[in-house]
Amino acid sequence: MIPNNTKFSNPLFGRILTAMVTPFKKNGAVDYELAIKLSNYLCENGSDGIVLCGTTGESPTLTWAEQHNLFVAVKGSLNSRSKVIVGTGSNCTSEAIEATQKAYEFGADGALVVVPYYNKPPQEGLYKHFSSIANAASDLPLMLYNIPGRTGCNLLPTTVNKLMNFPNILSIKAASGRIEEVTELRAACGSKLSIYSGDDSLLLPMLSVGAVGVVSVASHIVGLQLKTMIESFQKGEISIALDIHEKLQPLFKALFETTNPIPIKAALELRGWQVGSPRNPLTPLIKEKRESLLQIIQNLSL
């Protein structure tokens, strides 16, 4: 069921969505039991919902069967208590359509659909790609995902505005690293599009120009702090929000010192969550960066 509109005051997916890591056992298999425990912990500690099988979840190295089993495990545990959004994007339109349709069939609350990567389609190709997905899964709320640093392709606000004709395209994860992206999207699309920051470090600045929340990596370990920051901003307690924003900057920076999700997996292990190493070709965090990350975590009294 697609709502008639999405309100700035009450976004469909909530304010804080954790882009959850995929836990692996020592033998490299997905640890579904730990994924259930982690997702429940996150939703009890600040997160309004979980994004599975995104960048942080190492979707490029998960089989479709693993992605399906991961969703079934997590959604079955959380049930209706929290939103579960599934990454269904691909640089092959037919593959993305199939994945998005299956996400709907198995009860996902929404799908995160990334801009096609590597083949770098023009804007008309991006429009056709996303419109085809929206038509094929018309009852599933969709969140577009613009991350040109990874895809090599930028989804322009004018193209997003054209896509707003599809009632199930309700939101976008803006991860270009540019605060101006929010302003440009709001100028093109108005308030009918819910814009989520795709960068923890830019959450507060993006809130100030119209974003509704964040698809977060740091919320694995500072979800409650992020929740307080957003609530303080909403109440006009800007000095409190700014204080949290500034205190968390060293952590935000450390979590992206190297390729995500390498640092956040290390941070979780330092907090006692044995989520395993990333799958090849990603590698574990090197010793020096791990020690630096530990110091930051200790300084924050986490």
Curated annotation (Swiss-Prot):
Entry keyword annotation includes Cytoplasm: yes
Q: What is its main location?
A: cytoplasm
Q: What is its EC number?
A: 4.3.3.7
Give GO MF terms, alphabetically. 4-hydroxy-tetrahydrodipicolinate synthase activity
Primary enzyme class: lyase
Q: Which SMART domains match?
A: DHDPS (SM01130)
- The UniProt site entry described as Part of a proton relay during catalysis is assigned to 55, 118
Q: Name one GO biological process term.
A: diaminopimelate biosynthetic process
Function, in words: Catalyzes the condensation of (S)-aspartate-beta-semialdehyde [(S)-ASA] and pyruvate to 4-hydroxy-tetrahydrodipicolinate (HTPA).
What is this protein called in UniProt?
A: 4-hydroxy-tetrahydrodipicolinate synthase
Q: What is the lineage of its organism?
A: Bacteria, Bacillati, Cyanobacteriota, Cyanophyceae, Synechococcales
